[in-house]
Every structure is written in structure tokens, then in C-alpha cells.
From Swiss-Prot:
One of its GO terms (cellular component) is T=3 icosahedral viral capsid. It is an enzyme of class 3 (hydrolase). InterPro entries: Peptidase_A6 (IPR000696), Viral_coat (IPR029053). This is Capsid protein alpha. Its EC number is 3.4.23.44. Residues 1-12, 28-40 have a biased composition (Basic residues). The active site is at residue 67. Ca(2+) 5 binds at residues 244, 246. Ca(2+) 4 binds at residue 216. The gene is alpha. Belongs to the peptidase A6 family. One of its GO terms (biological process) is symbiont entry into host cell via permeabilization of host membrane. It comes from Nodamura virus (strain Mag115) (NoV). Ca(2+) 2 binds at residue 216.
Length: 399
């Protein structure tokens, strides 16, 4: 009989051979894994280097907040060729919400207009409640002071992005209520209506007027929304969702929509837009951001409203702004692909405390989805501290 110890001694060389064979077979696998990781890093670096400086500036303007001192970039790097005037609009304003009311802040892609504001009783409809404009600083310098010279300096526009944030400043013992955010697709249309002329017999004439479709959504809360306590605040972005960045003309002669001599019923509009001290300038190709703040009776809700927009204008040659125009940047497919990827994947909105998480998500989209490294600063200081792993190669571009 062969003892167990003897059998173990005889089997030991065979076990050692198998272990050595396994180690030898694993070595190529490890080398392949290292080679794959090395190739991925090289691809990330190559793609980053392939992206042009104007492309990086475009993403910086589109997705960096106004808290950072950045220029508006050199324009949208698509196939358009011509002189453009990139502009980064910024608004920072304190706001107090009326107790017992629900306040609608509609951030729409209207050049020079930060948002439209309306108030209604809690639970009531916004139908027929005028949306009053809140202008960006410098509106008159860009669009003139009268409705007849709105297009004297710039004749056309297209949006790269816009964003808005409500940052509560209320006392923690006095606030109450909720904040809800969702997107509304608005469209400028030309509607017809019949007008009776006092002749004998009376004559009916067909008239045309511009109108904004989609405002009925002010009374709707879609499933795809952000809802939270007022004290949590919100931050949201909207980008161009059309296949191309199309230019739209600057509208002239409209102090309201519909015009003053046309009723909402005639224009088939849910409610009207008023522009006290400003004018209606047109409507771009991106969803409006609807921010609904509900303030119960007795609550004290105050906040800082921040709105920003990256817009590209076509300057008028007879304007003094023409000398500041520049050639539109060359087509950059890497930057445009990054823009579209982020547009698909960013959430409707986030709470103020989650700003860092929001921007970490944007950064991960750029790294994993497109295999190039970048870093994007956040909308508030807390967001900037949440970003890790800044790539030194392009870090200076995002400071």
C-alpha cells in the first residue's frame, strides 16, 4: 500500500507543472489587458488632440456656468462659414416669491431675454396670465431702444445652450413650498384669424399674426420632471435639439406676442408675452425650461435667480459691433459629437446640493462615451470642488 504522503510527493511535481503552465498561459492574457488599456489611453489622448481649440471653447461656453470668468468662445464649430458675433448672456438677480401664489419662471430661447415670469393662485391655471419679460443686462446696447431698430446691430441668431438655477436664500425656519422643473417645446408660428371691418355690409378680412405654440404646457407637469422642496433649489440646462444649428431672423416691431391689437383667442395662444422695456426678438431651437415655485401662505421664500445663454449672432455691417465679429470656426465633428452626447444624457434638472454630481455626470459622458478626457466646471463653487482628476493637458482651458 502506498501511503498518502507518498502519493502527495509524487503528485507535487505534476501540480507545479500545471501551475507553471497556468501562469504561462495567463501572461499573454495580462499582456493583452495591459495593451488594451494602453490603447484606450492613447485613443483618448489622440481624440483630445484632434479636437480643435475652438471646439473646446465651444463646449466650455455651452456647459460652463457664469460663476467662472470665461469668454464666449469663437462660435459654433459646424459647417457654417461667415462672420459671427458670439455672445454669452448672464443674469444674476435676487427674487422674492409671493406667498399664496405659484410662480412660473419660463426660460425660453428668446435673444436678450433671461426669462418670462407669471404668477397665479396656487392650483389655478396660467391661461390668460401674461408672461412678463426679465431682460439680460445690456439688452438696449445689442437690440436698440425701440421696436423699429431691434435688428439694427444684429440680424440673425442661433443658440448653443442656455441654463437656469434657483439658489434659495430663505431662513430655514421660514421657507415652505416646492419647486418643479420640466421642459417645454415652443414654436413660433403664423396664425390666421378673421377681422370684421365696419363697412356696409360688414366685411370679413383674413389677417395673419405671429404666435407661440406650446404654452398650454404651463398647466401640465409631465412625468419627466424634477420635483423637490423649495429649499433644495434647482439647476437645469437646455441645448439645441435640432439636427443642425439654424440661424433665425431677429424680429422687429413686436412689443408683445401677440401684438397689442390682437387677442389671445384670435392668435390661438394660451397666454400672451409682454416685454416692458424690451421687445420680442425671436425664438430659437431648444426646449424652454419651466421652473414652477409654489409658495404657501405665510412662507418666506427668497432666492438668487441665475440665467445664462450662449448665443451666436450675425452682425449688421453698419453696426459698430461688426468690427468685433470673427470668422466662424472650422467644422469640428469631435466637439459636435460631444455636444450631442451630453444633450442626450444630462438630466432634466438637479438640486443645488447635487450640482457636483451633475457635472461629474457630464464629465463621465465625455470620457466614457467619446474616449477623450476633459473637465467641466460646475454651476456653483460646490460643483467645482466636486470635480476630480483634471487632465493637465487641457486643464488651463477650463479654469
Amino acid at each position: 500500500m502506498v501511503s498518502k504522503a507518498a502519493r502527495r510527493r509524487r503528485a507535487a511535481p505534476r501540480q507545479q507543472q500545471r501551475q507553471q503552465s497556468n501562469r504561462a498561459s495567463n501572461q499573454p492574457r495580462r499582456r493583452r489587458a495591459r495593451r488594451t488599456r494602453r490603447q484606450q489611453r492613447m485613443a483618448a489622448t489622440n481624440n483630445m488632440l484632434k479636437m480643435s481649440a475652438p471646439g473646446l471653447d465651444f463646449l466650455k461656453c455651452a456647459f460652463a456656468s457664469p460663476d467662472f470668468s470665461t469668454d464666449p468662445g469663437k462660435g459654433i464649430p459646424d459647417k457654417f462659414q461667415g462672420l459671427v458675433l458670439p455672445k454669452k448672456h448672464c443674469l444674476t438677480q435676487s427674487i422674492t416669491f409671493t406667498p399664496g401664489k405659484q410662480t412660473m419662471l419660463l426660460v425660453a430661447p428668446i435673444p436678450g431675454i433671461a426669462c418670462l415670469k407669471a404668477e397665479a393662485n396656487v392650483g389655478a391655471s396660467f391661461s390668460g396670465v401674461p408672461l412678463a419679460s426679465v431682460e439680460f443686462p445690456g439688452f438696449d446696447q445689442l437690440f436698440g431702444t425701440s421696436a423699429t431698430d431691434t435688428a439694427a446691430n444684429v440680424t440673425a441668431f442661433r443658440y448653443a445652450s442656455m441654463a437656469a438655477g434657483v439658489y434659495p436664500t430663505s431662513n430655514l425656519m421660514q421657507f415652505a413650498g416646492s419647486i418643479q422643473v420640466y421642459k417645454i417645446p415652443l414654436k413660433q408660428v403664423l396664425n390666421s384669424y378673421s377681422q370684421t371691418v365696419a363697412t356696409v355690409p360688414p366685411t370679413n378680412l383674413a389677417q395673419n399674426t405671429i404666435a407661440i405654440d406650446g404654452l398650454e404646457a404651463l398647466d401640465a407637469l409631465p412625468n419627466n420632471n424634477y420635483s423637490g422642496s423649495f429649499i433644495e433649489g434647482c439647476y437645469s440646462q437646455s441645448v439645441c435639439n435640432e439636427p443642425e444649428f439654424e440661424f433665425h431672423p431677429i424680429m422687429e416691431g413686436y412689443a408683445s406676442v401677440p401684438p397689442a391689437n390682437v387677442t389671445n383667442a384670435q392668435a390661438s395662444m394660451f397666454t400672451n408675452l409682454t416685454f416692458s422695456g424690451a421687445r420680442y426678438t425671436g425664438l430659437g431651437d431648444m426646449d424652454a425650461i419651466a421652473i414652477l415655485v409654489t409658495t404657501p401662505t405665510g412662507a418666506v421664500n427668497t432666492a438668487v435667480l441665475k440665467v445664462w445663454a450662449c448665443v451666436e449672432y450675425r452682425p449688421n455691417p453698419n453696426s459698430t459691433l461688426y468690427e468685433f465679429a470673427r470668422e466662424s470656426p472650422a467644422n469640428d465633428e469631435y466637439a459636435l459629437a460631444a455636444y450631442r452626447k451630453i444633450a442626450r444624457d444630462i438630466p432634466i434638472a438637479v438640486a443645488c446640493k447635487d450640482n457636483a454630481t451633475f457635472w461629474e455626470r457630464v464629465r463621465s459622458i465625455l470620457k466614457s462615451g467619446l474616449n477623450f478626457a476633459s473637465t467641466i466646471p460646475g454651476p456653483v463653487g460646490v460643483a467645482a470642488t466636486g470635480i476630480k482628476g483634471i487632465i493637465e493637458t487641457i486643464g488651463s482651458l477650463w479654469v
